[in-house]
């Protein structure tokens, strides 16, 4: 390799490393109801926005609940498994994020220190879709499970 090619090789290497390290979850995700398995009692539509912030990731949920009423909730945290306060939802007062790998992370919702709903998210290799597998209990204490299919906008 000649002296002119070395800087190019270093630049390409740094670009590839940065691209690989990028968080595939960042951006706006919209629920595709027709590809999802949603039981009665869960929200009807939802858009989730993941934004990079100085101290981690800010996650905002906007949608329509089972009664047709709009909802908004969110939190800011990191993928460290620690609990972070959440506002705007009856099923949780805290959430934690834990990254399994570049394409898989888990969210645990807690109310009063007890787990309510756990969601395992798997993002497709192309980063354009992801599936969330929900399990746990509703705000009323009833068991619930669902499979949500999201598309990146």
Regions found by a protein language model. Name each.
Residues 1-7:
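Positively charged n-region of N-terminal signal peptides that target proteins for export
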Residues 3, 15-16, 45:
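A detector of low-complexity, intrinsically disordered, Ser/Thr/Gly/Pro/Ala-rich segments
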Residues 7-17:
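Bacterial N-terminal signal peptides
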Residues 21-153:
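Hydrophobic small-molecule pocket/channel-lining residues, especially in calycin-type beta-barrels
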């Amino acid at each position: 390799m000649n002296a002119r090619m070395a800087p190019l090789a270093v630049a390409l290497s740094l670009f590839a490393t940065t691209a690989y390290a990028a968080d595939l979850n960042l951006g706006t995700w919209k629920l595709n109801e027709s590809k999802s398995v949603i039981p009665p009692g869960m929200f009807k539509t939802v858009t989730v926005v993941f934004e990079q912030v100085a101290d981690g990731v800010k996650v905002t949920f906007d949608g329509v609940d089972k009664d047709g009423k709009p909802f908004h909730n969110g939190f800011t945290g990191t993928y460290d498994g620690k609990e972070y306060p959440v506002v705007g939802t009856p099923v949780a007062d805290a959430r934690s994020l834990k990254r399994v790998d570049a394409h898989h992370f888990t969210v645990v919702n807690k109310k009063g220190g007890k787990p309510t709903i756990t969601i395992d998210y798997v993002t497709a290799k192309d980063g354009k879709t992801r599936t969330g597998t929900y399990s746990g209990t509703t705000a009323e204490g009833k068991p619930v499970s669902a499979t949500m299919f999201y598309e990146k906008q």
